From Swiss-Prot:
Residue ranges, Extracellular side: 29-61
The protein's name: Probable potassium channel protein 2
All ranges on the Cytoplasmic side of the membrane: 1-7, 83-343
Cellular component annotations (GO), alphabetically ordered: plasma membrane
Organism: Methanocaldococcus jannaschii (strain ATCC 43067 / DSM 2661 / JAL-1 / JCM 10045 / NBRC 100440)
Record bears the keyword Cell membrane: yes
Ranges for domain RCK N-terminal: 107-227
Transmembrane segment boundaries: 8-28, 62-82
Motif segment (Selectivity filter): 46-51
Broad class of the protein's primary localization: membrane
Amino acid sequence: METSKKLVIVAVLSITLILTYAYLISIIEGVDYFTALYFSVITITTTGYGDFTPKTFLGRTLTVVYLCVGVGIVMYLFSLIAEFIVEGKFEEFVRLKKMKNKIKTLKDHYIICGYGRLGKVVGEKFIEENIPFIAIDINEDVLKEEYEKYPDKFLYIVGDAKKEEVLKKAKIDKAKGLIATLPSDADNVFLTLTARELNPNILITAKADEKEAIRKLKIAGANRVVSPYLIGGLRMAEVSVRPGILDFLSTFIKIAKDEYEEDIELRKFVIEKDSELAYKSLKDANIRGKTGATILGIRREKEFCINPYPEFILKPGDVIYAFGTEENLKYLENLVKKKKKKL
């Protein structure tokens, strides 16, 4: 049991014992209650001024029992108080009290459920961008360690994030978003269901270890599902097989397909000498308007221009990198292949 809880229990027991003894002595010895209370306190603390002593046999017997039991309890109480102060428990108590007061005033904040490796990355990003959040984890040591790094920006609650009372402590009814990064997919599904029930409007982003869990988390109420293993695996495959400046884009487009069922593709198109687009500016070519595809960048020999300006002039040999739906990219392919009209 924590020192603070033991301190409260022993303190309540001591006060109850003092008041009860005072009441009994006032009746047995026939004195007023204040005098009896005064005698009760100086007796249990072994002060013993001697200005008042029980006169009856019953009063003296009760005092002997009171001394045997009460002195031990009070001495234990004093030792707990000393431990509470010396071990920094009092300082921690004050700190937690301040933290609870801060949490009570929060609104439009985020709740990170599970402060492991992934949750920690999310938290540090939020701290960097001054986004208010509360971290929830069952491991108090991990939370304390993080608090010591960011004492002014890190708020936390020790507990099981799947439980309603813990989420309510984190003010889920006033939260803007919840990040579910618990260890298992089953835990994240249960957490998502609970969070969605407590706040139907909250934005929930959940972690999925298995690909099959993505669908289940969405059914449970997650707005977005992220699979770290899927992202990491695709990224490693891309940089191994197709290393280059745009490999990461194809990775995330693949993720968009797998996780969000978005029909998006990334392709490259070469401008030929007789292409209608050759020697036209991007503004005049109006690729976006004609095809719906978005140009990410243009490679010219060894140089690469990301997000080129509208005044950029297309030349033969330029490689256009664009993304869009299959239909968008088909229109762009036809536009690139379209020949110039001969005069």
